[in-house]
Regions:
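His/Glu-rich zincin catalytic helix
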Residues: 1-73, 109
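Acidic/histidine-enriched segments that form metal/cofactor-coordinating
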Residues: 66, 73-161
């Protein structure tokens, strides 16, 4: 059984930097790599008057940094066949990239720039507000999403999740 476990389960290495940031690494022979930042902040952390902010910020971080406009952010990984994306859930906000291993430096530098140097341009805030409103309306028109939300409310009553 031990041999089976060793062969099937991935081996993760974990490092904790002096600033508390945790790095998790899984060695792989694949030519495709994934890199990202998971921020321990999601919708559960929002106060009632802040609902939707985590998701809003997730959208806005792609809209500009101190050295890049939105177009440059979106095309930086696409130009080399990579992908750049993000998502927000109740527990976390994640921004990540998938790319050929030879482009690790490019992906990591871009992610660091986005996570630590986003500028949140006013004109983009106004545009993205409309996008988020459309997403909310689409979500509210989806019965399965509404049922799932009601189910979670019953299970986690009185809990941030």
């Amino acid at each position: 059984m031990k041999n089976l476990k060793e062969n099937l389960l991935p081996t993760f290495n974990q490092y904790i930097l002096p600033n508390g940031m945790r790095i998790i690494h899984e060695p792989s022979a694949s030519k495709v790599a994934y890199c990202g930042f998971a921020v321990d902040a999601g919708t559960r952390d929002e106060l009632e008057n802040e609902q939707g902010m985590a998701h809003f910020v997730e959208h806005l971080i792609f809209k500009g940094t101190a050295k890049r406009k939105a177009w440059h952010i979106l095309n930086r990984m696409e130009n080399v066949g990579g992908d750049l994306n993000a998502y927000t859930n109740k527990e976390e906000t994640v921004i990540y990239s998938a790319f050929l291993t030879e482009h690790f430096g490019r992906a990591f530098e871009l992610l660091v720039d986005i996570v630590f140097h986003s500028t949140f341009p006013q004109r983009e805030i106004e545009k993205e507000t409309e996008v988020i409103i459309d997403e909310i309306q689409s979500y509210e028109d989806n019965p399965s999403e509404l049922i799932f939300d009601d189910f979670e409310d019953l299970i986690f009553r009185g809990h941030p999740l």
